[in-house]
């Protein structure tokens, strides 16, 4: 190589050293100084891995003083280059800059600059970059973005609600599904969509204290959302880091009690600029026109400051009209300001519901009914629809559906309230109760007698709680290590049941963690039964491992022993047998226990086994739950109401289970009350609202569409390719399970989402639902999104060289594969990617500028190519540099037409969709006051900003591959 002192070269193997300068040359070696790092390198002259840095007219270069110039002419004298051009800061022309004064921190970011500087990537990285661009663009355009990545079953009514609400600007809605239908999942889906699209960035979730960890686990496990739990301690710590402690985290969970207890804390919450507020158990917020509770006022204050609000609550029928109005008032106080007016409005919706029922029945409509529909919808252009709906044509069904949609759009609260019932949702199992009456051991009888004497001054409530758990009374006198399990007949029954049902997975729930731990030891030591334990003292990771062991079919645990609190938020619908070793104190907790198995998607009827001790509070409670409330075999929406109404009587019977006089009457009264309330709830059902919330055929089609996307084999192939190139080890464990661990040669030292110990993943939704330790990998998973970002935000794979062995072409024939990206810059919340995500345009040009991309598909072509080592590649580039420059100019001339077509199509789509949505809502505003002015304003503003951003869209070269034909 001809070296001259002062020339600038770059290392092919250590490009991070920057621009080097030749400082010494002898017959056999050359020394380069790299000023940006202060390091020297000694190379052999004959075979040095360095590339001469030579810029061309049109390039922008930087001097060591920091100013830039546009190169117009290059002169060479005695082996040294001088660049002549115009300074960009002063616009002075004819400025000369000798190469020795070039900035040494030079970074080659443009693909062509990297290629000419010898920074040649491996061929597989170029292919990965193109695939990443292609798949990333496709995913942004996919319908239902944000709904595919969560670890949940594809349940139509949940997807319907999430799809509707998740796309809105600052949604303010009430989610009031019946228990077990997945309000938490619906809220998580909405959050996931809003965060993924950029519509929201900061989220606050307020829940009862007992549900904080459940929400934390659900958001992380199902949606990969890492929330921070704020309590007094965390709040105090964060005060050292920021004036407003809540500014230290983007996603926060706290309890309602924590929020309302301190005036300053509530002020900090209100000032924290949240985008979305989620309130669980909102029906516990007590309100009346004269005296709203402090809790209600705290949420009301927050709801005034936060644009988006999701309230999760019991069904409107359970709440009562006034309480239901109070929730709606939090969402839109301007719309819901007068309770009497609200009651009157609700009565007026009955004809609308009747009209919808009439359309769905499919019967021919009379002229009077057609006229009534016309008046309700109140639009001039629906006559053809009405005629089609009443005809025998194939269009009749779709016309009826369209009319139903129009009616539902006009339904009073259908935009702010979503409510599904078990009656309206298919897929729930039956529940069968098996009670096992067992004798009360003498040891317990003695302990209870002594406890009664010593605890005479205890309240009835405390005595009732004690009597539910006789083993704890026994341990109070005999010590914590007393071996109650040696004589408790429930333990003997449990061991017998498990040994005779070895093939069944059994969930055992008890009130306390200590009971679960003691039972595990007994089962293991006496019968060798594999039992996992699950309680609140375990970390989330430990609970995951226990749940995963229980989920394993062949070698897993037969039994999972759960404490009351430890099992919150976890579902095990792959099991259908449940044992309640003891009973919870109230019907809500009973339903929560059964709800661990009684979920949509449960394939078998649920067998509920309740071994109970006679003459104890357990025997009282099992009768009251079953005979009084029918709470074991059916969900019990009346449970809390009746529990509150008979609380004192029930407590007395539990505290003194021997005194049974009048107990049969109590059960009879409770059953009558239960039946009456149930009938009242059924009568009050808003069937129109149910149809709207359920989504019908549209929701079913949505679920099926996402299920089809689950089978995308491109994702698996791409992910494996991505992991290989990043340097992530993959260990296939079978059963659709793969363990990923970091290797010693990672592309980056710390890859987000991959811990030192590694992670377990699956691409199969069913496996992910059964095994909570396995992360469900989709295009929306952070691991894939971080991988895409790692590849596309840097220059990985942006320049490479390949050889094409093809005897049909002359040796030395050049082809240049160009990957352009058409894109527009805009704030994330505009969700511009719906219309124009960064979109790759591939061109394959010969030296005459002929574009062969349409005839030569990428993957097929890629398989025909062979890699070139960096040294040989640099030599090839230097030899054909001028030809490549010429082809690049031909490419620049051609890309504009393709890019303009993409941009114009995006503009048309955006204008059409956003204008149509605005027009629809403006038209509905006249007949449905639940459409907020701020929502209309936001859509119009969004449309204008989107169109302006698309007007500014452009394109750039993202990657290139030089291909040289060879016959060898």
Curated annotation (Swiss-Prot):
The keyword Nucleotide-binding applies. It is an enzyme of class 3 (hydrolase). Gene3D superfamilies: 2.30.30.140, 2.30.30.930, 3.30.360.80, 6.10.140.1500, 6.10.140.2230, P-loop containing nucleotide triphosphate hydrolases, Tandem AAA-ATPase domain. One of its GO terms (biological process) is regulation of DNA-templated transcription. It holds the Pfam family Tudor_1_RapA. It comes from the Bacteria. ATP binds at residues 177-184. Transcription regulator that activates transcription by stimulating RNA polymerase (RNAP) recycling in case of stress conditions such as supercoiled DNA or high salt concentrations. Probably acts by releasing the RNAP, when it is trapped or immobilized on tightly supercoiled DNA. Does not activate transcription on linear DNA. Probably not involved in DNA repair. Belongs to the SNF2/RAD54 helicase family. RapA subfamily. Interacts with the RNAP. Has a higher affinity for the core RNAP than for the holoenzyme. Its ATPase activity is stimulated by binding to RNAP. This is RNA polymerase-associated protein RapA. The lineage of its organism: Bacteria, Pseudomonadati, Pseudomonadota, Gammaproteobacteria, Enterobacterales.
């Amino acid at each position: 190589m001809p070296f001259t002192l002062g020339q600038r070269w770059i290392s092919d193997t250590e490009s991070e050293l920057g621009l080097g300068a030749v400082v010494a040359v002898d017959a056999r070696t050359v020394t380069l100084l790299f000023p940006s790092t202060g390091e020297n390198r000694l190379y052999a002259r004959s075979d040095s891995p360095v590339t001469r840095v030579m810029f061309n007219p049109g390039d922008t270069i930087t001097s060591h003083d920091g100013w830039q110039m546009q190169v117009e002419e290059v002169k060479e004298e005695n082996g040294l280059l001088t660049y002549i051009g115009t300074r960009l800061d002063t616009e002075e022309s004819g400025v000369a800059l000798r190469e020795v004064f070039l900035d040494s921190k030079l970074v080659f970011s443009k693909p062509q600059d990297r290629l000419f500087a010898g920074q040649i990537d491996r061929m597989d990285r170029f292919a990965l970059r193109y695939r990443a661009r292609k798949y990333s663009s496709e995913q942004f355009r996919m319908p239902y973005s944000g709904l595919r990545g969560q670890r949940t079953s594809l349940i139509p009514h949940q997807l319907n609600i999430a799809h509707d609400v998740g796309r809105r600007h600052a949604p303010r809605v009430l989610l009031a599904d019946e228990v077990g239908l997945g309000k938490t999942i619906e809220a998580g889906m909405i959050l996931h969509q809003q965060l993924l699209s950029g519509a929201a960035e900061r989220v606050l979730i307020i829940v009862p204290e007992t549900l904080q960890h459940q929400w934390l686990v659900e958001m992380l496990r199902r949606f990969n959302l890492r929330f921070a739990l704020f309590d007094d301690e965390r709040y105090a710590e964060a005060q050292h880091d920021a004036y407003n402690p809540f500014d230290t985290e983007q996603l926060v969970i706290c309890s309602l009690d924590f929020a309302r207890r301190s005036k300053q804390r509530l002020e900090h919450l209100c000032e924290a600029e949240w985008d979305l507020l989620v309130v669980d158990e909102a029906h516990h917020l007590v309100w009346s026109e004269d005296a709203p509770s402090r809790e209600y006022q705290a949420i009301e204050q927050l709801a005034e400051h936060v644009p988006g609000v999701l309230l999760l609550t019991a069904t409107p029928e359970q709440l009562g009209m006034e309480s239901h109005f109070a929730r709606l008032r939090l969402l839109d106080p301007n719309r819901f300001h007068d309770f009497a007016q609200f009651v009157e409005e609700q009565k007026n919706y009955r004809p609308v519901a009747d009209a919808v029922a009439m359309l769905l029945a499919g019967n021919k409509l009379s002229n009077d009914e057609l006229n009534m529909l016309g008046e309700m919808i109140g639009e001039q252009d629906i006559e053809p629809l009405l005629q089609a709906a009443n005809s025998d044509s194939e269009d009749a069904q779709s016309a009826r559906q369209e009319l139903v949609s129009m009616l539902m759009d006009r339904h009073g609260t259908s935009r702010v309230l979503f409510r599904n019932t078990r009656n309206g949702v298919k897929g729930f199992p039956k529940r069968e109760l098996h009670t096992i009456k067992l004798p009360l051991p003498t040891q317990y009888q003695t302990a209870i007698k002594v406890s009664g004497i010593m605890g005479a001054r205890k309240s009835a409530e405390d005595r009732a709680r004690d009597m539910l758990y006789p083993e704890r009374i026994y341990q109070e006198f005999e010590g914590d290590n007393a071996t109650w399990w040696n004589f408790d007949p429930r333990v003997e029954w449990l061991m017998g049941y498990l040994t005779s049902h070895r093939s069944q997975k059994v969930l055992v729930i008890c009130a306390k963690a200590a009971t679960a731990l003691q039972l595990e030891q007994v089962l293991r030591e006496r019968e060798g039964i594999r039992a996992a334990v699950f309680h609140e003292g375990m970390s989330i990771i430990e609970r995951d491992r226990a749940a995963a062991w229980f989920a394993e079919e062949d070698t897993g645990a037969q039994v999972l022993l759960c404490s009351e609190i430890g099992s919150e938020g976890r579902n095990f619908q792959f099991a259908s047998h449940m044992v309640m070793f003891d009973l919870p104190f109230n019907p809500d907790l009973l339903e929560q226990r059964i709800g661990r198995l009684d979920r949509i998607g449960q394939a078998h009827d649920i067998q509920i086994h309740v071994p109970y001790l006679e003459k104890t509070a357990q025997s009282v409670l099992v009768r009251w739950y079953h005979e009084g409330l029918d709470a074991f075999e059916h969900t019990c929406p009346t449970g809390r109401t009746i529990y509150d109404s008979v609380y004192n009587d029930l407590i007395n019977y539990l505290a003194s289970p021997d005194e049974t006089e009048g107990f049969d009457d109590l059960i009879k009264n409770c059953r009558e009350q239960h039946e009456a309330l149930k009938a009242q709830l059924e009568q009050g059902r808003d069937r129109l609202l149910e149809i709207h919330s359920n989504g019908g055929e549209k929701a079913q089609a949505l679920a099926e569409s996402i299920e089809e996307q689950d089978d995308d084999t491109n994702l698996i192939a791409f992910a494996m390719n991505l992991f290989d190139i990043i340097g992530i080890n993959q260990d296939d464990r079978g059963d659709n399970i793969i363990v990923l661990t970091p290797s010693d040669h990672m592309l980056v030292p710390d890859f987000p989402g991959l811990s030192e110990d590694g992670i377990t993943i699956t691409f199969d939704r069913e496996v992910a639902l059964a095994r909570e330790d396995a992360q469900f990998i989709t295009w929306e998973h952070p691991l894939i999104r971080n991988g895409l970002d790692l590849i596309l935000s840097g220059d990985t794979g942006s320049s490479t060289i390949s050889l094409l062995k093809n005897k049909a072409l002359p040796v030395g024939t050049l082809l240049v594969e160009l990957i352009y990206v058409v894109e527009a810059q805009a704030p994330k919340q505009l969700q511009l990617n719906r219309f124009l995500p960064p979109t790759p345009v591939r061109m394959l040009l010969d030296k005459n500028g002929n574009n062969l991309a349409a005839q030569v598909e990428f993957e097929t072509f890629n398989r025909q190519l062979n890699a070139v080592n960096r040294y040989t590649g640099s030599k090839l580039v230097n030899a054909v540099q001028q030809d490549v420059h010429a082809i690049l100019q031909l490419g620049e001339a051609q890309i504009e037409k393709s890019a303009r077509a993409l941009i114009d199509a995006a503009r048309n789509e955006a204008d059409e969709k956003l204008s149509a949505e605005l027009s629809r809502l403006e038209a509905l505003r006249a007949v449905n006051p639940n459409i907020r002015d701020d929502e209309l304003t936001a859509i119009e503003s969004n449309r204008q900003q989107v169109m302006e951003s698309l007007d500014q869209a452009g394109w750039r070269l993202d990657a290139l591959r030089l291909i040289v034909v060879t016959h060898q």
